[in-house]
Amino acid sequence: MLTFPLINDTSRKIIHIDMDAFFASVEVRDNPSLKVKPVVIARNPLQTGGRGVVSTCSYEARAFGIHSASAKEAYDLCPQAIFISGNYEKYTKVSKQVREIFKRYTDDIEAASIDEAYLDVTENKIGAQSAIKIAKLIQHDIFVELGLTCSAGVSYNKFLAKIASDYEKPHGLTLIMPEEALEFLAKLPVEKFHGVGKATVPKLHALGFFNGGDLQKADPVDLAERFGVYGWELYQKANGIHNSKVKNYRERKSVGKERTYGKLLYLPDDIKAELSKISGKVSDSLKSHQLKGSIVILKLRYSDFTTLTKRKSLAEKLESPEEIAEVAQEIFEELEYDESLGVRLLGVTVTEFGAQKATLDMQ
């Protein structure tokens, strides 16, 4: 008989910091004439034939409905938007400056990306008992010294802290206490749960799960049977349980991204195009962590859940999206791909970082 022990550590004090519209905010800071204008970080689609994707955009641009989209879609929504190609080196430099501010308060820092990080301030450098106090100090320091705003979430685990940071933006600060977690999560739509993708939402809705309250009342064994380990993790999260520790860069051994498809992929060209997109996300993560790897791993899962995994070792370390995509596509071509089955999941991972200095941008 399966058993599911519910062990909940509520003793930690975790802060999640999310820089507000980071790339766009840096550009507006450095060019005040852009203030209160719709700024989109992407190459101008009129100059690229409609190619390119939006990295981020200002809140003024988001008011037009622009979020994660192609540059062409962004232009269609807001023709008056100001498109800026972006300067990754500049953003990385600012990210390091944010990191130095974090280090005033704790060394227990985990970079989730170039513009967000988790901090464990249970024990901290200023002897503060209040995580809220530290979050306010960090917000103050970032605003005064860097001219930028960030949103902060405070709770007893990473999952809740991240949800809290997204609750009130921009420049918000939200606290979720242990005794408030269940009620807070009960009202939260399932699509707001970190890790629930677009393909999973309709499946949950079809089963009658629309919010955290529905998941709290679910049978964990049934969820696990339907969704595997992820179903059990979802049940735990709905009950405020997420005991993953804040991990610094020394514990990072690989960087990877996966995507599950509600509509199966069949054509090799479509699969290669998706591998390019995933490789771009892996590259962003590698760059934000200042890492390069010499092994690329491709993961492919068919509609019948048969999973293929193949790796390729390289003489040189890589980090660019083009290089990663090229290797991932080469690995795919070497697989005995069965086009009749259809692909439900693709994943790309880069590992074998070696002895390089792995200093994280925000860590």
Swiss-Prot record:
Free-text cofactor note: Binds 2 magnesium ions per subunit.
Per the record, what is one GO cellular component? Answer: cytosol
Q: What is the lineage of its organism?
A: Bacteria, Bacillati, Bacillota, Bacilli, Lactobacillales
Described purpose of this protein according to its UniProt entry: Poorly processive, error-prone DNA polymerase involved in untargeted mutagenesis. Copies undamaged DNA at stalled replication forks, which arise in vivo from mismatched or misaligned primer ends. These misaligned primers can be extended by PolIV. Exhibits no 3'-5' exonuclease (proofreading) activity. May be involved in translesional synthesis, in conjunction with the beta clamp from PolIII.
Q: What organism is the protein native to? A: Lactococcus lactis subsp. lactis (strain IL1403)
Active site (catalytic residues): E116
Instruction: Identify its protein family.
Output: Belongs to the DNA polymerase type-Y family.
Question: What is the first-listed, main subcellular location in coarse terms?
Answer: cytoplasm
Q: Which UniProt keywords apply?
A: Cytoplasm, DNA damage, DNA repair, DNA replication, DNA-binding, DNA-directed DNA polymerase, Magnesium, Metal-binding, Mutator protein, Nucleotidyltransferase, Transferase
For this UniProt entry, which segments traverse the membrane?
A: none
Q: What is this protein called?
A: DNA polymerase IV
Q: By its UniProt entry, which Gene3D superfamilies does this protein fall under?
A: 3.30.70.270, 3.40.1170.60, 5' to 3' exonuclease, C-terminal subdomain, DNA polymerase, Y-family, little finger domain
